[in-house]
Amino acid sequence: MGAMVPRTLLLLLAAALAPAQTRAGPHSLRYFETVVSRPGLGEPRFISVGYVDNTEFVRFDSDAENPRDEPRVRWMEQEGPEYWERETQIAKGNEQSFRVDLRTLLRYYNQSEGGSHTIQRLSGCDVGSDWRLLRGYEQFAYDGCDYIALNEDLKTWTAADMAALITKHKWEQAGAAERDRAYLEGTCVEWLRRYLELGNATLLHTDSPKAHVTHHPRSKVEVTLRCWALGFYPADITLTWQLNGEELTQDMELVETRPAGDGTFQKWASVVVPLGKEQNYTCHVYHEGLPEPLTLRWEPPPSTDSYMVIVAVLGVLGAVAIIGAVVAFVMMMRRNTGGKGGDYTLTPGSQSSEMSLPDCKA
């Protein structure tokens, strides 16, 4: 498996750019690249997608009518033609390398060319509020399974199987780790800073989470309490459950943070508790968009007795209002007839002088 084309980028005026006001961090720049072979349907398809802080900002698709690196957010339209031409050439170079790698891995695994196979790559960097590298990524998977990855020391590789060991030895001889480390510690961090400056208004805002707790019966003696955090940005958030002030790390089920589809994120954490003991458990939500952490409990609905009392009171009040309206109407009619309401009666079959029914005609 050959080394990928390096993402060597020209940092235009990077040193001259004034530091932009940025959120405290951390921040991330990541690229996800995938190639899928499709025997009998033409060349393998290659897709590259770039993310800044979990926001897709660029994309390349070899199946497009005119394959080019394209902006996915409005703020990337500030980049000029030279940038897009350069990034397009990088993507096309990686596309060709991936196609060669597909054929190489077919040999390593002694597979035929008749089936469909996939190579995936994750590369990128995470930085802290001081712009120092927190972690670099250079990871590969084949047919959905780990293949080879650059370790956190950015100096050594971990191979998942015997085939990946062949790639590891080749890359060690070629000094691939040193090249990748230089990119991750330098170029990647600088371009992340650049993208954050371009998308400052969008990327550096915060949306505080809306949180609530739901109640789900499990059995006659247990219930599940689920703490929801919705509509927050950025994606970094912490949810914990506590019992009388002690964290329940081992007993808590926690899902990965998920995109909501509108640029915000959602997450939940649940815990199983004894029925009747729900009020002893509290959910705690930590997010940079909150002035202070949230503490929530499950709020039980009003009891049936309380509900019936409320309905009864509302019924009595409604009846009183109706009676009052009738009395007011009668009093008004008495005033309109000079107080002789007792002499104004209609006997069965009689008609008032002011109202008559039309004749029925055959």
UniProtKB/Swiss-Prot annotation:
Annotated region described as Alpha-1, given as residue ranges: 25-114
TM regions (residue ranges): 307-333
GO cellular component: external side of plasma membrane; lumenal side of endoplasmic reticulum membrane; MHC class I protein complex; phagocytic vesicle membrane; plasma membrane
Free-text description of this protein's post-translational modifications in UniProt: Polyubiquitinated in case of infection by murid herpesvirus 4, by the viral E3 ligase K3 (mK3), leading to target the protein for rapid degradation by the endoplasmic reticulum-associated degradation (ERAD) system. Ubiquitination takes place on lysine, as well as serine and threonine residues present in the cytoplasmic tail. Hydroxylated serine and threonine residues in the cytoplasmic tail are subject to ubiquitination via ester bonds instead of the classical isopeptide linkage.
Subcellular location: Membrane
GO biological process: antigen processing and presentation of endogenous peptide antigen via MHC class I via ER pathway, TAP-dependent; negative regulation of neuron projection development; positive regulation of T cell mediated cytotoxicity; T cell mediated cytotoxicity
Pfam families hit by this protein: C1-set, MHC_I
Any coiled-coil regions, as ranges: none
Ranges where the record places region Disordered: 340-362
Region Connecting peptide, residue ranges: 299-306
Sequence ranges on the Extracellular membrane side: 25-306
Signal peptide: 1-24
Presence of the UniProt keyword Cell membrane in the record: no
Sites carrying sugar chains: 110, 200, 280
Modified residue annotations for Phosphoserine: 353, 356
Region (Alpha-2): 115-206
Domain Ig-like C1-type: 209-297
PANTHER family (alphabetical): HLA CLASS I HISTOCOMPATIBILITY ANTIGEN, C ALPHA CHAIN, MHC CLASS I-RELATED
Protein name, UniProt field: H-2 class I histocompatibility antigen, D-K alpha chain
Originating gene: H2-D1
